[in-house]
Every structure is written in C-alpha cells, then in structure tokens.
C-alpha cells in the first residue's frame, strides 16, 4: 500500500495536527519513545536482553551523529507508531557507502497497518537519493513472519546469512 503522506528524509518538521501517519527523522525529544520501542524489540529476541541505559545510549549516539546513522519514525501528531535505525558504513564489495538497517519495530498496537512497509519504502528511497549501494539487515532466525515481511519488501537471503537489498 502507498503511504498517505511521505515527507522528505531530510525534513525536520513535525507532523501537523491533521496529518495522517508519515515518516520523518527522529529528534532527541523522541528518545524516550524510541527507547521503549527498542526495549520491546529486545524483549522478543533470544539474542538480546532489554537494558534501558544501553538502548538509550545507543539511540542517542545515532541521533547525535547524523554522519554515522539516522533514525526515522512513523509519526501521527505527537505519537510515534514505529521506528528504524540506519547505520552507515563502506563496502569494498559494492565500492561505496552501504546501510546496516536495524531496529525495525512497530508498536504492538499498530502492527499490521502498513507502517513497517511505509518505513522500509522510505529507507529505500532515502538510500537511492543518497547513493547508497546496499541495505543489509539482520532478522531473527526464528521469526518466519519477520523474514517473510522483509522478502515482500525486496530483501533476499545472501550466502553471508543476513538479508539484504541491493540499491541500484
């Protein structure tokens, strides 16, 4: 489904009162809500344990260093429905900058409404416009639902184990 409003990845404007849910960059003021979303994600993984201090510190590092990564949120008015964080690195295989996409999480009350697809579409558009060469993500091995979602978004399995989407 096509998102009703798609704001610019570089926009720092917050949603207007009558705006439908849309994607925009997170701000430092969003840190408490982002921390809650990441802690929820960590609590559902066998590989991680939620730790408010660690999650908040990691999110703050990304927010304070936009040259190293970005966090985007699905926002409606003053409520955050979901988030994704992107970390930037260089790939010698692709000969350019690539993205490691992490913490794709939608609040439990808002799952199944297209917000995950809205976020990933936004990330792909951002990556293309900024000339990134690939988006790589790690998804839980045991979560067939998560893997199917990302396959529908154009990601594929690689021989290196993570899933990825090549950006042309």
Describe each model-derived feature in a short phrase.
Residues 22-34:
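A short beta-loop-alpha structural element at the N-terminal edge
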Residues 36-61:
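Conserved GNAT-fold acetyl-CoA-binding loop/helix
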Residues 61-73, 100:
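A short helix-loop-beta-strand connector motif used in the catalytic cores of GNAT acetyltransferases and
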Residues 73, 79-88, 105:
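Conserved beta-strand in the GNAT
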Residues 120, 127-139:
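Conserved GNAT acetyl-CoA-binding A-motif
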């Amino acid at each position: 489904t096509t998102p009703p409003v798609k704001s610019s990845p570089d926009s720092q404007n917050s949603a207007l009162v009558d705006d439908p849910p849309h994607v925009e960059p997170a701000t430092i003021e969003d840190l408490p809500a982002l921390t809650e979303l990441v802690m929820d994600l960590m609590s559902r993984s066998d590989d991680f344990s939620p730790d408010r201090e660690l999650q908040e510190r990691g999110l703050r590092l990304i927010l304070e260093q936009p040259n190293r990564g970005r966090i985007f949120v699905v926002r409606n008015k003053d409520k955050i429905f979901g988030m994704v964080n992107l970390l930037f690195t260089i790939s010698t295989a692709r000969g350019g900058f690539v993205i490691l996409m992490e913490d794709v999480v939608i609040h439990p009350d808002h799952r199944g409404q297209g917000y995950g697809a809205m976020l990933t579409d936004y990330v792909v558009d951002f990556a293309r416009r900024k000339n990134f060469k690939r988006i790589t993500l790690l998804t839980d091995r045991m979560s067939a639902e998560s893997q199917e979602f990302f396959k529908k978004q154009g990601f594929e399995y690689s021989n290196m184990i993570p899933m990825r989407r090549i950006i042309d």
